[in-house]
Amino acid sequence: MLSERRLEVLRAIVQDYVGTEEPVGSKALTERHNLGVSPATVRNDMAALEDEGYIAQPHTSAGRIPTDRGYRLFVDKLAGVKPMTGPERRAIQNFLDGAVDLDDVVGRTVRLLAQLTRQVAVVQYPSLTRSTVRHVELLSLAPARVMLVLITDTGRVEQRMIDCPAPFGETSLADLRARLNSRVAGRRFADVPQLVQDLSEAFDPEDRGTVTTVLSTLLETLVEETEERLMIGGTANLTRFGHDFPLTIRPVLEALEEQVVLLKLLGSAGDSGMTVRIGHENAYEGLNSTSVVSVGYGSGDEAVAKLGVVGPTRMDYPGTMGAVRAVARYVGQILAES
């Protein structure tokens, strides 16, 4: 167990290295921080921290830099979450409030996170495996052509055009709309197939072909939309950190192109807590020089998806964690109000 003084020395090393991008020496630490001890004592503390794997010497005659283990201790014990200022919170809310639909919410969230943290932002669309149907709208476009509009509880809207096998009157369409919503509104996607399986029997024989076509389109839409989707932005920010990656940023960029990798990085959508994965804690080798900060978002207490950022391990953890948490909270509020 490290002493309080050595924890303070580690905190100072992390803060200085993140701020200056330069290895940190004992003389600089005593000049910049009120540690209350001599440079010689700080050197001894740094030697102990190095022996225990919390800091390392990148070059001979250079200062020290934090290791993955050092960053982990900093995040777990030393770094609080930096709160956003009042003006920052208002700017976030005003920017997100301008969104017109779910795609716009996700797009604005990605841009906002990338701008606030100057990292790569990743936002997962709400997981429809946990979504419920808010409403199904059916609109007549022609005697034998119908538009189906599926609206979910998370604000997601999907539209499908349906060519009916026979003309379908307004009265029949209104009847189908009412019967359909009475069965599926407020129900989870997984329950819908069983709820509508005998619905066509309530209609006249000449209309059953069209009803079956509409129901098949609805079920196909539900299956298609349960696929996980995400949006990524701010990859250009990585070019500012070229020297933070041991060889090249290419493995990082390749990893960011793999949706499966990103979904695993963000973790389970049902876990709403803040997660910080540092360096080699990331299972994907191409991301061993990065850190991932993610958190769940959603309406109410249940998280429906994750959002987060990817950047070098030399990251402003308190500021990044604060920005990610604040943005997630506002996105959740928008979903709840939509």
Swiss-Prot record:
This is Heat-inducible transcription repressor HrcA. One of its GO terms (molecular function) is DNA binding. Pfam families: HrcA. Belongs to the HrcA family. Negative regulator of class I heat shock genes (grpE-dnaK-dnaJ and groELS operons). Prevents heat-shock induction of these operons. It comes from the Bacteria. Coiled coil: none annotated. The gene is hrcA. HAMAP family: HrcA. Signal peptide: none annotated. Keywords: Repressor, Stress response, Transcription, Transcription regulation.
